[in-house]
């Protein structure tokens, strides 16, 4: 796997990281404000945490944070009930990113909710992977755009000279609402994740709901992918950390 990555995926990943640093440089003031906001919430690693956690921090170019609450969502029903509830409460923006989005029962409920919030004045920024969602019809995307949502595919390459790379995919599943609540995990947007598909039957996967400073870190992950796909940096909350819901 490592040699294959080195041959097939190395240059694209390097380009992705360069694009992320470019986004930071282009919006340096906002990035400095974000880092200043996050500094009091950085976790202090001790013992073996320094050895292993430090490696993860260097690889991700992000710090571990303290003062978060993590709510485990153990199936698709719990996951999308919580996601829909959070989106309903959105006042400023919703960030959405999934590997697979389907034009089925769940997919259309999701689309209709985002369209309604967009018409209410909430900004919607939506990324989907062009291979994972290759069956998504154009009318689905067009409907969201007509409602005012910004929806874009995550391409495997950038620039006309780059060859297509099916291996460089984006499997992230992220939702962030107003920079105050976030979701990340294993569920995509499709009926099978609710366990109602006749083809797949019962489905077991896990998501988590986050509050606290980790939400802004998750938002930064989305921003890197969004800039890669669009060369745009949307105006987001980088300076206010919403306290965790619990202790």
Predicted regions and their residues:
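N-terminal localization/anchoring segments of enzymes in phospholipid and broader phosphate metabolism
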Residues: 1-247
């Amino acid at each position: 796997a490592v040699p294959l990555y080195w041959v097939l995926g190395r240059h694209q990943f390097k380009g992705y990281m360069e694009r992320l640093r470019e986004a930071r440089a282009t919006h340096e003031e906002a990035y400095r404000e974000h880092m200043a906001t996050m500094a009091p919430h950085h976790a202090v690693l001790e013992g073996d945490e320094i050895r292993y956690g430090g490696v993860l921090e260097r690889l991700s170019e992000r710090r571990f944070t303290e003062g978060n609450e993590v709510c485990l969502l153990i199936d698709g029903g719990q996951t999308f009930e919580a996601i829909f509830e959070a989106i309903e409460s959105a006042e400023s923006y919703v960030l959405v990113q999934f590997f697979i989005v389907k034009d089925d029962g769940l997919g259309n409920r999701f689309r209709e909710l985002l369209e309604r919030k967009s018409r209410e004045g909430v900004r919607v920024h939506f990324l989907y992977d062009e291979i994972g969602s290759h069956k998504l019809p154009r009318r689905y995307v067009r409907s969201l755009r007509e409602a005012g949502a910004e929806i874009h595919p995550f391409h495997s390459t950038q620039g006309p000279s780059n060859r297509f790379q099916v291996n460089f995919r984006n499997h992230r599943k992220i939702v962030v609402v107003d920079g105050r609540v976030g979701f990340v995990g294993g569920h995509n947007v499709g009926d099978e994740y609710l366990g109602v598909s006749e083809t797949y039957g019962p489905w077991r996967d896990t998501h988590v709901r986050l509050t606290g400073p980790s939400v802004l870190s998750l938002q930064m992950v989305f921003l890197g992918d969004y800039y890669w796909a669009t060369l745009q940096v949307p105006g987001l909350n980088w300076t206010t950390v919403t306290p965790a819901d619990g202790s």
